[in-house]
A protein has these predicted regions:
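Sequence/structural signature of beta-propeller domains
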Residues: 1-243
Length: 243
């Protein structure tokens, strides 16, 4: 059973009880079947939700469905009411040299590009793709714009956006490619990758001093919270200045 833990100012860890907590619930109508498997025998159902975020009165949910376009983005009004089947999404994966509809978004962040709300979404083997939020209509199918290929044999874990020195940056931690920092200054100029390629598109730098980062989130305008795993497997929760 999943639990939520809290840490107080003294560093004491305790369980956050959900007893008698008011809540609402949304049930996905077209999640993969309990016994559905991927090509490697892994459960597809556990990928029904791979990431989520609250934006302007809606909960945005990425994951898989049981539809032909299995990769799905959902925009669910909050407080929850009826949940539709979501939007099937397709991308061109430059590292694989093909169009894909079955790979789920691993992590995403809402971001405005030239005053238009978008999702910036990262996938396994690390294509970075943008989707206009206005395209996420129930039952429709949309093609994302791949604006970067950031390296294969890797899974993006978390992604945040922050401002520093008058410029917005994306910070993303990964399973095997460290923590990447990308400027969004010219993000609107990338029209999309359409052929097989290696690392290309929106450039990044690797933050060398940040190693073993398993989870990443913004703490405030100047700091981030990271969960770091060392070589022994021990986990440390740390606060860092945004780079």
């Amino acid at each position: 059973m999943a639990v939520i833990l809290k840490v107080d100012a003294a560093g004491k860890i305790s369980e956050f009880s959900l007893d008698n907590i008011k809540h609402s619930k949304a049930t996905l109508p077209n999640a993969p079947a309990p016994d559905a498997k991927d090509g490697r025998g892994g459960s597809l159902r556990v990928q029904s939700i791979t990431d989520l975020a609250y934006v302007d009165g809606k909960v945005l949910v990425a994951g898989l469905s049981n539809e032909e376009f299995a990769s799905t983005l959902r925009s669910i009004p909050f407080p929850f009411s009826a949940v539709d089947g979501g939007t099937g999404v397709e991308i061109f994966h430059g590292a694989h040299g093909r169009f894909e509809t079955n790979a789920p978004v691993r992590t995403f962040v809402p971001y405005e590009i030239q005053n238009e709300p978008h999702l910036l979404a990262a996938y396994t083997c690390t294509p970075l793709v943008k989707f206009p939020l206005s395209d996420l209509k129930p039952g429709s199918k949309v093609m994302g714009t791949t604006i970067a290929e950031l390296g294969n044999r890797n899974r993006p874990l978390d992604m945040i956006v922050y401002a520093k020195g008058g410029t917005d940056y994306i910070l993303m931690n990964n399973s095997s490619r460290g923590v990447m920092k990308m400027s969004t200054k010219d993000i609107h100029k990338y029209e999309g990758i359409k052929e097989k390629t290696d690392i290309t598109g929106l450039p990044y730098e690797t933050i060398a001093e940040l190693k073993g980062v398993q989870q990443l989130d913004r703490l405030d305008d100047n700091n981030a919270l990271i969960l770091v795993q060392d070589e022994s497997g021990a986990m440390d929760l740390k606060t860092i200045a945004l780079p």
